[in-house]
Amino acid sequence: MTNVPDGLKYTKTHEWYKVDNGIATVGITDYAQSQMTDIVYVDLPEVGDKKKVGDVLLTIESVKSAEDVYSPLTGEITEVNQELTKHPENINKDPYGNWLVKMKVEKEGEYLTAEQYRKLIQ
């Protein structure tokens, strides 16, 4: 069973995010990491990069494929999770604890609630 925590916002392209005080923490869902299997590399963006809703945020490579992760919002990247450059497999272990980037939110895109996302991936 795929883990879909309440209290997060989800996208149809399998990203999650949570906004606190105008800063969004962004990652990929448990469903996404389970489809990719063993993650071996994360190509993180640069702090200061500006992204719009739907832009490619970064790329994650697994033994199975390379997948783009899309920005769920418009804003500037304020922090990247450097730990993932050394240990990309941490995303497989805990996709909600191992966020990818933090962004200053200018505008949110369309999102799904946890309940709506659960229905999408059934």
Swiss-Prot record:
It comes from the Archaea. The glycine cleavage system is composed of four proteins: P, T, L and H. It comes from Thermoplasma volcanium (strain ATCC 51530 / DSM 4299 / JCM 9571 / NBRC 15438 / GSS1). This is Probable glycine cleavage system H protein. Binds 1 lipoyl cofactor covalently. Its cofactor is (R)-lipoate. InterPro entries: Biotin_lipoyl, GCV_H, GCV_H/Fam206, GCV_H_sub, Single_hybrid_motif. The modification N6-lipoyllysine is found at K64. Belongs to the GcvH family. One of its GO terms (cellular component) is glycine cleavage complex. Pfam families: GCV_H (PF01597). GO terms for biological process: glycine decarboxylation via glycine cleavage system. The glycine cleavage system catalyzes the degradation of glycine. The H protein shuttles the methylamine group of glycine from the P protein to the T protein. Residues 23-104 form the Lipoyl-binding domain. Keywords: Lipoyl.
